[in-house]
């Protein structure tokens, strides 16, 4: 499948009120540092029909006014991206990072752009993808703006879906010592995984002060990782950072079962039983240094659109292209349906916009404790699977894909996209799958026939 171009589907039918304007912050833009925003509904092929706290790509770029840009994406439509820049800023350097198989097509699209550099990220394990969605933008005043997103750089992802992005920034230090920060360390460690392909950006970011940022980057990089667990990416990295943020508390009373919610747009093969991975090593990483007692095991739910959720969405069944779960996979893990909940976002007025965002949240005594916004879906390919390599006599973590997310532990900055309490699937609900025919007409009068 070509991943560098994506056509824009039909019009949206969602109607929501106009956005609230934020005051300009000390970062020189209208974006609040440390905040999570939604992308708009409409605004490209149809009139914009806003939801609160949303920003379009052209608004972001007009606010920041980058003179040097680094974009990571899975799918990338260059004409859409460059068209989102203000005309006066289209002749500045842009570096684009995609999966190595997609780099040749992108090079063809940008062959007349002298200041555009294309980087192809290595995908050493079959079926892996370069799934990271992140932008680092340098402005003329020496600020470096970091955006961690769930949206690909294609029109449909920025118009008809429930997407989110996280924003923050740092300031270049002209001379003297740059204060050390975990956020900067995270960023530089991730860029190092591209070997020497992004060394120029590493050198720039080494001179940037990110010390005001308390949030942490949670990322995955492909490969067979045999280094110590504390140095591994994927879900072991989440375990380590959660353990640092929330050390073991022997005095804590488990009066209720804590709840973990995963919300994603695709699901991988998780095994024939939940203990294989879902409630095994993945849940153990979500719990960090504070595992639930055996008498009160953690509850774990998955928010994923049902057939009816997609059928009644603003794009109808076409919106289901962004939630590519397959019936052939679901048939092997029917146990998962008992954990599934419908997509509901009435509080944010986005129930009718199919979710492409990915969110992981811990609730304790019905209160959200942390939120993770990420590109990583619920899959071993994204988060990794620990196994023992008998031939090498070593434990290894196998990850197929590149992923990027940000962990926020400050409740005042949470922006959880789904409603809580959750709405479980009914006895007649089924998850939307792309390889099964759906004959009941959708909101646009169409049926779904598998491609």
Swiss-Prot record:
The protein's role, per its UniProt record: DNA repair enzyme that can remove a variety of covalent adducts from DNA through hydrolysis of a 3'-phosphodiester bond, giving rise to DNA with a free 3' phosphate. Catalyzes the hydrolysis of dead-end complexes between DNA and the topoisomerase I active site tyrosine residue. Hydrolyzes 3'-phosphoglycolates on protruding 3' ends on DNA double-strand breaks due to DNA damage by radiation and free radicals. Acts on blunt-ended double-strand DNA breaks and on single-stranded DNA.
Compartment(s) of residence: Nucleus
GO CC term (a single one): nucleus
Residue ranges of the region described as Disordered: 1-34
Site label Interaction with DNA, positions: 379
Family as reported in the entry's similarity comment: Belongs to the tyrosyl-DNA phosphodiesterase family.
Biological processes annotated in GO: DNA repair
Gene: tdpo-1
Region (Interaction with DNA): 266-269
Top-rank taxon: Eukaryota
Amino-acid positions noted as binding substrate in the UniProt annotation, renumbered to this chain: 133, 358
CDD domains cross-referenced by the UniProt entry: PLDc_mTdp1_2
EC number(s) recorded for this UniProt protein: 3.1.4.-
Membrane spanning stretches: none
Name used for this protein in its record: Probable tyrosyl-DNA phosphodiesterase
Active site feature: 131 (nucleophile), 356 (proton donor/acceptor)
Compositionally biased intervals (Polar residues): 22-32
GO molecular function annotations of the record: 3'-tyrosyl-DNA phosphodiesterase activity; double-stranded DNA binding; exonuclease activity; single-stranded DNA binding
Cleaved signal peptide residues: none
Keyword Repeat: yes
Major place of residence: nucleus
Keywords per UniProt: DNA damage, DNA repair, Exonuclease, Hydrolase, Nuclease, Nucleus, Repeat
């Amino acid at each position: 499948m070509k991943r560098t171009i994506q056509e824009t589907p039909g019009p949206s039918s969602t109607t929501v009120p106009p956005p609230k304007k934020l005051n300009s912050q000390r970062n020189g833009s209208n974006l609040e540092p440390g905040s999570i925003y939604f992308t708009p509904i409409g605004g490209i092929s149809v009139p914009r029909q806003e939801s609160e706290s949303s920003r379009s790509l052209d608004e972001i770029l007009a606010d920041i006014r980058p003179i040097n840009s680094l974009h990571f994406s899975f799918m990338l439509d260059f004409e859409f991206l460059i068209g989102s820049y203000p005309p006066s800023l289209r002749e500045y350097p842009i570096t684009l990072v995609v999966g190595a198989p997609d780099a040749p097509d992108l090079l063809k699209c940008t062959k007349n752009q002298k200041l555009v550099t294309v980087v192809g990220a290595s995908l050493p394990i079959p079926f892996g993808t370069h799934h990271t969605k992140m932008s680092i933008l340098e402005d003329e005043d020496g600020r470096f703006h970091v955006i961690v997103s769930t949206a690909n750089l294609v029109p449909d992802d920025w118009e008809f879906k429930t997407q989110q992005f996280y924003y923050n920034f740092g300031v270049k230090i002209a001379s003297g010592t740059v204060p050390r920060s975990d956020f900067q360390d995270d960023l530089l460690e991730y860029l190092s995984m591209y070997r020497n392909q992004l060394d120029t950006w590493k050198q720039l970011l080494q001179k940037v002060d990110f010390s005001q940022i308390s949030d942490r980057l949670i990322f995955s990089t492909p490969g067979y990782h045999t280094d110590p667990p504390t140095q591994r990416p994927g879900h072991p990295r989440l375990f380590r950072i959660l353990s640092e943020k929330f050390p073991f508390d022997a005095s804590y009373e488990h009066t209720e079962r804590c709840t973990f919610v995963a919300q994603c747009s695709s699901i991988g093969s998780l095994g024939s039983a939940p203990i294989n991975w879902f409630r095994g090593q993945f849940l153990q990483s979500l719990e960090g240094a504070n595992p639930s007692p055996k008498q009160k095991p953690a509850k774990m739910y998955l928010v994923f659109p049902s057939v009816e959720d997609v059928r009644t969405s603003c794009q109808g069944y076409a919106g289901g292209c962004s939630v590519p779960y397959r019936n052939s996979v679901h048939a092997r893990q029917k146990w998962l349906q008992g954990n599934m909940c419908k997509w509901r976002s009435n509080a944010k007025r986005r129930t009718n916009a199919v979710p492409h965002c990915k969110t992981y949240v811990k609730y304790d005594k019905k209160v959200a404790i942390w939120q993770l916004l990420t590109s990583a879906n619920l899959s071993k390919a994204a988060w990794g699977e620990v196994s023992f390599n008998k031939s090498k006599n070593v434990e290894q973590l196998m990850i197929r894909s590149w992923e990027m997310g940000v962990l926020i532990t400050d409740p005042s900055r949470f922006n959880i996209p789904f409603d809580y309490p959750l709405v479980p699937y009914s006895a007649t609900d089924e998850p939307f799958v792309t390889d099964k025919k759906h004959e009941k007409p959708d909101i646009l009068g169409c049926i779904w026939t598998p491609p």
